C-alpha cells in the first residue's frame, strides 16, 4: 500500500506526471469541466470533500510554483479566499519558494482549465472555490 499522503490512484498518477509549468485544477462542484481535461471526480455530496481538504492533500504532494484564481472570489467568497491565501503562504514556507498568485475573470478561468492536465472536482458548494495550480520543480 502507498505510504504517501495521496491514496487516490488517479490524483497520485497525475501529480507524478506533472512537468514544470503543467497545471492541475481543484474546483467546486459546479465548475464546468472541459472534455479536453481529465476529470477526477471526488464529490460525494454537498461539501464532501471540501475544496480546502482537496487542496491541502494535493499540495502536500505537488510542488507549486503559481496559483490562478478567479477575481470574483475576493468579493463573492472572501472567507475561502483568505483561507486559500493563508494555505499558499504556509506552502511557500514549507517548499522554500515564492508562489506567484494571479487573478483572472471567471470566464477566462474556465477557458484556462481546458489546458490543464486534470480537473479535480470537490464537493464544495460555495462560489468561485476554484484554483489552477501550476507545477514547479523541486530542484
UniProtKB/Swiss-Prot annotation:
Its EC number is 5.4.99.62. Substrate binds at residues 28, 106, 128-130. Coiled coil: none annotated. It is an enzyme of class 5 (isomerase). The keyword ATP-binding does not apply. Catalyzes the interconversion of beta-pyran and beta-furan forms of D-ribose. PANTHER family: D-RIBOSE PYRANASE. Homodecamer. Belongs to the RbsD / FucU family. RbsD subfamily. This is D-ribose pyranase.
